[in-house]
Structures are given as structure tokens and as C-alpha cells.
């Protein structure tokens, strides 16, 4: 009797967000977990989410710079793996808190800290199970002009200023104003 393959549905990073799913404004960051600048940006994002609440949706997309941060790729994969169990944001914040210690064994410990009980977590990391999802993020980032993280977009427009609370707030406020000015869609007969 031939063995049957198990079909596994993978939740992509594009489907992992926090905030209001139907918000008219999406803040998207391309970042990585070993970068000091990305860690600072993560703190700014926390302030932004506190300020805007359900007026926006935030997505983090992976852009590990493996030439200078060798462990950033596996860290990104571990975040995607955590997302499969609904623990992406818990793992995301733990990775930034521990950005100087992102070896595979540490990632396994952080997964427990995030509340992940998946016995296959380490196997998935070692086997690169979620590597394609991270590579897809990198590819899309390159297509959008991302060169070095952190890079932010508000409704698909790159924020070219330094990602401070003030600069991101201005970009979000502008997008919120634009979304209010749009005429209501006409119903088809």
C-alpha cells in the first residue's frame, strides 16, 4: 500500500497582520531580526499601533541580510513557523528582544517562551520548511525597491524618511485623509 502524502496548508507572511483587517491604511515593514535599526523600528511600531489602534493594519515582511547577519534567515523562518500556530507576533517580539542570540537551539527555546508546543518546530527549522515563504518576502521587497531594512510602506507607498514615530505618523495621517476623500463605490445595476 503506497504512503499518502499529507497536505499541509501554510499560512504565508502576507496573511499575518495585527490591527484591523478591513482598515483603509496598511503599514508594512520589511525588516530582519538581527538589525539594531529594525529593533528600534519595532519599538516605534508598538507606539504607532498604540496610537492608531484599529484604524490601521500592520504587516511585517522578512528581508534578512544574510551577508552581515548570518542567523537572520533562520530567525525569520522561526517567526513564520510560529505564525502557523497563531504565535507570530509573540515570536516576533521575542526575536527582537534576543536579537544577539538567534542560534537554532535558542530559537527552539524562544518558541516555548512564545507558547508554541509544536514538536516539529526544530525539525521545520533545520529542514528549512518555511524558507520559501521568507524568500518570497525578499523577492517582493526587491521588486518594491527595498535594499536595506527597515523599510516602511504606507498603502504601497515607500516612506523615504527615517522611520521615526513622527515620520510614520505623518505618512499614516496623510493616507487616512486620502481614504476619507475617496468617493463611495457605485453599486452595479
Identify the role of each PLM range.
Residues 23, 54, 148:
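Short coil/turn segments at beta-strand junctions that form active-site/ligand-binding loops
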Residues 28-113, 117, 173, 182-186:
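Structural alpha/beta surface segment adjacent to cysteine/selenocysteine redox centers
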Residues 1-7, 186-189:
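N-terminal targeting signals for export/organelle localization
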Residues 8-25:
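A short beta-strand-turn-helix
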Amino acid at each position: 500500500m503506497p504512503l499518502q502524502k499529507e497536505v499541509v496548508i501554510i499560512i504565508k507572511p502576507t496573511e499575518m497582520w495585527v490591527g484591523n483587517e478591513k482598515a483603509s491604511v496598511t503599514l508594512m515593514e520589511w525588516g530582519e531580526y538581527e538589525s539594531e535599526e529594525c529593533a528600534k523600528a519595532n519599538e516605534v511600531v508598538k507606539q504607532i499601533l498604540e496610537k492608531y489602534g484599529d484604524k490601521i493594519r500592520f504587516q511585517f515582511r522578512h528581508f534578512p541580510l544574510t551577508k552581515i547577519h548570518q542567523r537572520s534567515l533562520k530567525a525569520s523562518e522561526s517567526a513564520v513557523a510560529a505564525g502557523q500556530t497563531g504565535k507570530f507576533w509573540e515570536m516576533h517580539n521575542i526575536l527582537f528582544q534576543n536579537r544577539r542570540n538567534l542560534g537554532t537551539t535558542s530559537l527552539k527555546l524562544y518558541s516555548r517562551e512564545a507558547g508554541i508546543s509544536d514538536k516539529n518546530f526544530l525539525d521545520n527549522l533545520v529542514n528549512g520548511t518555511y524558507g520559501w515563504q521568507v524568500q518570497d518576502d525578499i523577492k517582493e521587497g526587491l521588486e518594491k525597491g527595498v535594499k536595506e531594512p527597515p523599510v516602511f510602506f504606507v498603502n504601497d507607498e515607500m516612506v523615504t524618511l527615517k522611520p521615526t514615530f513622527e515620520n510614520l505618523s505623518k505618512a499614516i495621517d496623510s493616507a487616512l485623509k486620502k481614504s476619507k476623500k475617496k468617493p463611495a463605490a457605485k453599486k452595479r445595476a
